[in-house]
Amino acid sequence: MMSAIFTIEGPAGFDFDPARLEELYRMGFRITSLGWNEKNPLAGSHVSGGGLTDQGREYIKEAQRLGMIIDVSHISDEAFWDIMDVTQAPVIATHSNSRAVCNHSRNLTDDMFAEICKTGGVAGFNMCDDFVGTSPDLNTCCDHFLHFMELDPDGKHIALGGDLDGVD
């Protein structure tokens, strides 16, 4: 049996409107991020910086009321910590690597990974060259996985993420 989970990466397609989440939930969407690589009405990105906005807080509240999971991939460090202050449910990073292994703003710090674990969430590492390291190969990908395993020895909060479109 195969299954899929519908996700929203960057809710620009519906004008970042929290009121539209219920409609999307009825359509089968269960995971939502707050943006992609640019600042938007909900939050700052890893490129632009900036925290969670009031509209972003409303978006998270509505998504979690519906039972949707928040994906923190692509957001700024400040927005990440703002989300951790307001979340009432597990948070995931569907495709974010370890910043300790590759110092890129898209990757998670050890403290961020620990916080995701505390919520009961999961971090899915990816194989996109820019986020893996200067010599991206299978060994370097494994370095991210092994680093997360040092922080979460049971591996309950680690997954293989997406972003395979960025793999060369």
Feature map (PLM): residue ranges:
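Acidic/histidine-rich helix-loop elements
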Residues: 15, 38-52, 99-106, 127-139, ...
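Short acidic/histidine-rich active-site segments
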Residues: 127, 153-168
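Short, small-residue-rich loop/turn micro-motifs
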Residues: 36-38, 87, 162-164
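Hydrophobic faces of well-ordered beta-strands that scaffold small-molecule active sites
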Residues: 4-8, 32-34, 70-72, 91-94, ...
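Extended substrate/RNA-proximal surfaces in nucleic-acid metabolism proteins
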Residues: 2-4, 8-12, 16-38
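Active-site histidine-anchored catalytic micro-motif
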Residues: 31-41, 54, 63
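Histidine/acidic residue-rich metal-binding segments in metalloenzymes
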Residues: 16-26, 47-92, 105-121, 139-156
